[in-house]
Amino acid sequence: MAKIYDFPQGAERRRMHRKIQWNNAVKLSKNGWSKPEVKRWSFLAFISTGWYYFRLSVAVIFHIITICGLAVLAALSNTIFWIGGAICLVTWYTNDHQIWSTNNLTIPIVFGLWVLSLVAAPLIDFFSQKLPFYRLLVPDAKREEVGEDDS
């Protein structure tokens, strides 16, 4: 079979590779490319990065605590109703038929926990969709939200 293409061999091939490398280097240097430098962390960049990761960890911690607390309340809704109701009856008769006194807020707290346990499932869905604590990370959260809706 005959050679269709005449490829360079030996010294001619090395010269061609060097010329290609030289042309690439010239083209890249004209476009502003240079050897990558070792990035030195300034004090301000270090503080800024630390502040970002601090805000991220606070948002994650708040989200986890809120979701887990609401999940526990939702799971114990019936228990809160029956045991809390019994505690409220005892407190009602102990406090001379008052819903609360200056030193005893048992009835409003149990009632509030029970109502919160009833709305816990929709709140969990809301927090999981909107991620309100992660707005600590974005200075202009409304503008970012509009950008996501457009696409």
UniProtKB/Swiss-Prot annotation:
Keywords: Plasmid. It comes from the Bacteria. The predicted protein is highly basic. This is Uncharacterized 17.4 kDa protein.
